[in-house]
């Protein structure tokens, strides 16, 4: 789960990959103004040596013990947190590794990570999935529905097409077209910004929601959207590719 802090935007950074980080409303800018990508360096971790903790193992529900695995639900389109390997079927990423590590501490064989549209994950907890580690931001509304635990602190960043051809200004988003993933913190955040625009008598943000973040990146790079808004490690990883 992610904990987010609102901060100030950073400056434009160009990349060779078709899109560029344009701002980061949730983290302070780095010294050179670029989005931090150090978090994207290690995409997998060998959890096989992790041992069960007896005190925790004793608390595991019998139904999960019987299954022998922890069922994790995730939107597997959010690299480097969760995405498919080149075979197109094997999930990987730091959220996937975390689920497997937790399972081993619980005395299980490991975790399985199954894809689900992000907005459907929380309603599926307790029935289809035992747990979800899928880039969630902890919010008061979500805590009314499920128990949430923070294990990583990230920011949120805008990204634009290389060279910022539409002159997107992250400090003035009124009247722009922004792609965001359904059900995310970023969807709520850009909606808040859009409402602020209309309250000031300016044009609303044209919000373009999608189930997959990867679909949004393609549209930003091709010029269909002015920008996208996503977790900063996701923006950083996309730029590196």
Residue ranges and their predicted role:
Residues 32-132:
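Extracytoplasmic small-molecule ligand-binding "clamshell" domains
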Residues 136-143, 191-192, 221-241:
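A ligand-binding cleft/hinge motif common to bilobed small-molecule-binding domains
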Residues 70-74, 171-188:
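Short loop->beta-strand "edge-of-pocket" segments that line small-molecule binding or catalytic clefts
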Residues 86, 140-154, 195-200, 238-241:
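Ligand-binding "clamshell"
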Residues 5, 18-34:
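Bacterial lipoprotein signal-peptidase II cleavage site
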Residues 111-171:
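Acidic, polar ligand-binding/catalytic clefts
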Residues 99-109, 186-209, 240:
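Ligand-binding cleft/hinge of the Venus flytrap
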Residues 1-9:
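Bacterial N-terminal signal peptides that target proteins for export
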